[in-house]
């Protein structure tokens, strides 16, 4: 079994397949696992196995996603593939599958199609930083000029959405033929194309910065006063590291405050430092309990700033998902749940959009009634009377 060999001593990268329906995303996913399994770097996963993706609930939204893992000589990969277009939209917006990079699958026989464009735009909006292209079904195209034409079209499309189209690696091949070869136990020309694709993914998509190496950020969940010691705030560290003696800022809701960390505790034990993923209590010097509240964040000074206006890419839940039963219109005022708290905000719809129906995916402008620590890529939920009616990601800070 290949399973025994899986080790964590290689850098870990999250990727996924994106692209138009029926262009071969799932077949490529199966082909990658099959070709790499011949080298003992993966377990072979069947097409049907990947296609019958289990439904998962992410923030109340039902998403069908397949997760597979495999290795190359250089890295360990977690790979997501979604059966339906709506699943991709939900996945990318909720951040259920954070991708460090994506493999865009385009059929050489059809060229870029509407969802090809939509997935590239979504990647730009939700912050998928790198795209590598696999031109699939190349076995069905005899004309080399036609392949070149499709490649040019793909590069133009990437450029249009501010991806470096001219420098993006594009590999042409056939996922189906590679899968057939691997199943027959043959290392043929089509399998070689899949290996070439994975080499490009290894080279072109950088290893992500580990959460502990990023700037410190901790959303505040609760505030306590400990007599004789001062104020303690608790929460789960989102990124970075915090040490006793660090100068930090408290950002959001009220004007930004600067203070010093005088203690870090986990499970009532004193620690030298807390790091990404830890649930900790942080003791703050000279900070009054009434100056701090849930919804603010502790952070490294100047690393994140409070904002009230932003553009976001959102998915609005269907009635079946527990969302609204009716559309909403311009100036709709729900609550925006960011990290640990709700803040009311008003929504401005894009020009020409009269209303938004449950199940829609739309770009909105939001103005909050109180400032919140925000940056591009911050996720939020849209709530109404305590229930989630939408999910979104900040695509641009406006003010």
Swiss-Prot record:
Keyword terms of this UniProt record: Cytoplasm, Elongation factor, GTP-binding, Hydrolase, Magnesium, Metal-binding, Nucleotide-binding, Protein biosynthesis
EC number: 3.6.5.3
Region (G5): 174-176
UniProt region (G4), positions on chain: 136-139
One Pfam entry name: GTP_EFTU_D3
Record field: catalytic activity: GTP + H2O = GDP + phosphate + H(+)
Binding annotation for GTP: 19-26, 81-85, 136-139
Region of interest: G1: 19-26
Signal peptide positions on this chain: none
Residues annotated as domain tr-type G: 10-209
Gene Ontology CC terms: cytosol
Binding sites annotated in the UniProt record for Mg(2+): 26
Compartments, record wording: Cytoplasm
Ranges for region G3: 81-84
Major location (coarse): cytoplasm
One term of GO molecular function: GTPase activity
UniProt record similarity statement: Belongs to the TRAFAC class translation factor GTPase superfamily. Classic translation factor GTPase family. EF-Tu/EF-1A subfamily.
Oligomeric form and interacting partners: Monomer.
Function of the protein: GTP hydrolase that promotes the GTP-dependent binding of aminoacyl-tRNA to the A-site of ribosomes during protein biosynthesis.
The protein's name: Elongation factor Tu
Lineage: Bacteria, Pseudomonadati, Campylobacterota, Epsilonproteobacteria, Campylobacterales
């Amino acid at each position: 079994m290949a399973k025994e060999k899986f080790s964590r001593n290689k850098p870990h990268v999250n990727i996924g397949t994106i692209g138009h329906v029926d262009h071969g995303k799932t077949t490529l996913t199966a082909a990658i696992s099959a070709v790499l399994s011949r080298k003992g770097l993966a377990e072979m996963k069947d097409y049907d196995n990947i296609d019958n993706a289990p439904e998962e609930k992410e923030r109340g939204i039902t998403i069908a996603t397949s997760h597979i893992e495999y290795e190359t000589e250089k890295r360990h990969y977690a790979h997501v593939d979604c059966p339906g277009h709506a699943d991709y939209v939900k996945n990318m917006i909720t951040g259920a599958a954070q991708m460090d990079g994506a493999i865009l699958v385009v059929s050489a026989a059809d060229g870029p199609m509407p969802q090809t464009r939509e997935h590239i735009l979504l990647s730009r909006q939700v912050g998928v930083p790198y795209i590598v292209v696999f031109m699939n079904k190349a076995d069905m195209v005899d004309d080399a000029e036609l392949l070149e034409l499709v490649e040019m079209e793909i590069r133009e499309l990437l450029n249009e959405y501010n991806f470096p189209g001219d420098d993006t690696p594009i590999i042409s091949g056939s996922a189906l033929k590679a899968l057939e070869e691997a199943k027959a136990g043959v290392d043929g020309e089509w399998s070689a194309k899949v290996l070439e694709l994975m080499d490009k993914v290894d080279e072109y998509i950088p290893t992500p910065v580990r959460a502990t190496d990023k700037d410190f950020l901790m959303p505040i969940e609760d505030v306590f006063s400990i007599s004789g010691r001062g104020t303690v705030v608790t929460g789960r560290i989102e990124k970075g590291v915090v040490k006793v003696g660090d100068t930090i800022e408290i950002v959001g809701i009220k004007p930004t405050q600067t203070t010093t960390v005088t203690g870090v505790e986990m499970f009532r034990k004193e620690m030298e430092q807390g790091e990404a993923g830890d649930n900790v209590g942080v003791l703050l010097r000279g900070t009054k309990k009434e100056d701090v509240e849930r919804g603010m964040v502790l952070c490294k000074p100047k690393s994140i700033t409070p904002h009230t206006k932003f553009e976001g890419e959102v998915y609005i839940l269907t009635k079946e998902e527990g969302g609204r039963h009716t559309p909403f219109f311009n100036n709709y005022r729900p609550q925006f749940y960011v990290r640990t708290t709700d803040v009311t905000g008003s929504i401005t719809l894009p020009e020409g959009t009269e209303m938004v129906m449950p199940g829609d995916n739309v770009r909105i402008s939001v103005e909050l009634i109180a400032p919140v620590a925000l940056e591009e890529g911050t996720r939020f939920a849209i709530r109404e009377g305590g229930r989630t009616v939408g999910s979104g990601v900040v695509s641009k800070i406006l003010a």
